[in-house]
Amino acid sequence: MRKAKPKKRVILPDPVFNDQKVSKFVNHLMYDGKKNTSYEIFYAALETVKTKLPNEEKSALEIWKKALDNVTPQIEVKSRRVGGATFQVPTEIRPDRKESISMKNLILFARKRGGKSMADKLAAEIIDAFNEQGGAYKRKEDMHRMAEANRAFAHFRF
């Protein structure tokens, strides 16, 4: 076990929306230190979202935040060995981990989509998540279903 808990790194807000959440998302999206490319992909995706949902009164950023909320899991299962048997124990997720999981899932399922550019794939996944559909939303539902199925083992807290 480590001696001291590491300090939280300060993440600077992004240049366009002045939002830390956007910076975190772009950091997850980034490959090989190419942050400018990640920003371009993200902003292009938000533009595409705005053009595909023109009658929505919310801004593209608000749509993205709602999509993130829709794919954010509240509970997960962790493996715990008790007397030779391994149980899947449902546990609540810390707020920072919730955010991280939702961002990673949104990006993962956007990357898995076929064909087009990453900006288009990300935009499509954001729209699906906003409408409570798509791979990232399904992953969240599966996590919740798994926790519900293993509710009997909730007393094996960590």
UniProtKB/Swiss-Prot annotation:
Keywords: Ribonucleoprotein, Ribosomal protein, RNA-binding, rRNA-binding, tRNA-binding. Disulfide bonds: none annotated. One of its GO terms (cellular component) is small ribosomal subunit. SUPFAM superfamilies: Ribosomal protein S7 (SSF47973). One of its GO terms (molecular function) is tRNA binding. The keyword rRNA-binding applies. It comes from the Bacteria. One of its GO terms (biological process) is translation. One of the primary rRNA binding proteins, it binds directly to 16S rRNA where it nucleates assembly of the head domain of the 30S subunit. Is located at the subunit interface close to the decoding center, probably blocks exit of the E-site tRNA. Part of the 30S ribosomal subunit. Contacts proteins S9 and S11. Belongs to the universal ribosomal protein uS7 family. This is Small ribosomal subunit protein uS7.
